[in-house]
C-alpha cells in the first residue's frame, strides 16, 4: 500500500550516522587503560570496605569474619593505592575527593590501618586473625611476583607459623598449620640465596591457598 515511500527515522533516532554506533573508549593506549583499571580497583576496594563496616555495625557478620575480611581488604587497599599513587593522586583523601567517593567508615579503617575489632594487645584473638590473613596474602603475593629466594620468603612464613601457634582456638591438627610447617622445613634446608624452582612455587601457592581457605572455613564454623 505504501510501496515506494521511504521510512522516516523516529525522533531522536541516529539515522545514517555510523559514528554514533562506535564504542566510546576512556583510554587511547594500553598505559591509559591500565591507569583506569588501577583506579577502578582502588575505588572498588574502598566501596567494599565501606559496605563491610556497615555490615559489621548491623551485626550481619561475626567479629571473626569481619576481622579476616577487613584485614584482607586493607592489604588489597595498600597494593591498589601503590598502583594509583603519583603526580595526579598523592593521597587517598585526594582520590576520594576527585571521584566523589563518600566512604567515611572505610577511610577511618584505612587511617587506623587495622580492623575495629583489634586492640593494641598482640595476644588479642582478633589481632592474631588479622596477622594470619595479612601474612598468608603477603607470602602468596611475593610468590606471584616471582620473589622466591629463601631469605625473602622464610621470615614471613615463620611469622605466620608463630602467629598461628598463638591462636589457642586453632585445633592442634589444623591442616594450615601443618602445611606451613612442612614448607618451613623445606626452606630451612636451603641457603639464603637459594630460590624455589617453578614447580615448587606452583605447589607452594596451591598449598598456601588451600591453607588460607581452610583458615577462613574455620572462622566461619
Curated annotation (Swiss-Prot):
The protein's name: Vacuolar protein sorting-associated protein 28 homolog
Which lineage is the organism of this entry classified under, starting from the top rank? Eukaryota, Metazoa, Chordata, Craniata, Vertebrata
Per UniProt, what is the name of the gene that codes for the protein in this document? Vps28
Q: Name one GO molecular function term.
A: ubiquitin binding
Subcellular localization(s) per the UniProt record: Cell membrane; Late endosome membrane
Family statement? Belongs to the VPS28 family.
Function, please?
Component of the ESCRT-I complex, a regulator of vesicular trafficking process.
SUPFAM superfamilies attached to this UniProt entry: Endosomal sorting complex assembly domain, VPS28 C-terminal domain-like
Q: State a GO cellular component annotated for this protein.
A: plasma membrane
Predominant cellular place of this UniProt entry's protein: membrane
In the bilayer, the protein is annotated as:
Peripheral membrane protein
* The entry's keywords: Acetylation, Cell membrane, Endosome, Membrane, Protein transport, Transport
Q: Which ranges carry the VPS28 N-terminal domain?
A: 13-120
Source organism's superkingdom? Eukaryota
Give every VPS28 C-terminal domain span.
Answer: 124-220
Which residues does the record list as N-acetylmethionine (modified residue)? 1
InterPro entries linked to this entry = ESCRT_assembly_dom, Vps28, VPS28_C, VPS28_C_sf, VPS28_N, VPS28_N_sf
Record's keyword annotation contains Membrane? yes
In its UniProt entry, the species of origin is given as Mus musculus (Mouse)
Subunit notes for this chain? Component of the ESCRT-I complex (endosomal sorting complex required for transport I) which consists of TSG101, VPS28, a VPS37 protein (VPS37A to -D) and MVB12A or MVB12B in a 1:1:1:1 stoichiometry. Interacts with TSG101, VPS37B, VPS37C, MVB12A and MVB12B. Component of an ESCRT-I complex (endosomal sorting complex required for transport I) which consists of TSG101, VPS28, VPS37A and UBAP1 in a 1:1:1:1 stoichiometry. Interacts with VPS36; the interaction mediates the association with the ESCRT-II complex. Interacts with SNF8 and VPS25. Interacts with CEP55.
One of its GO biological process terms is: negative regulation of protein ubiquitination
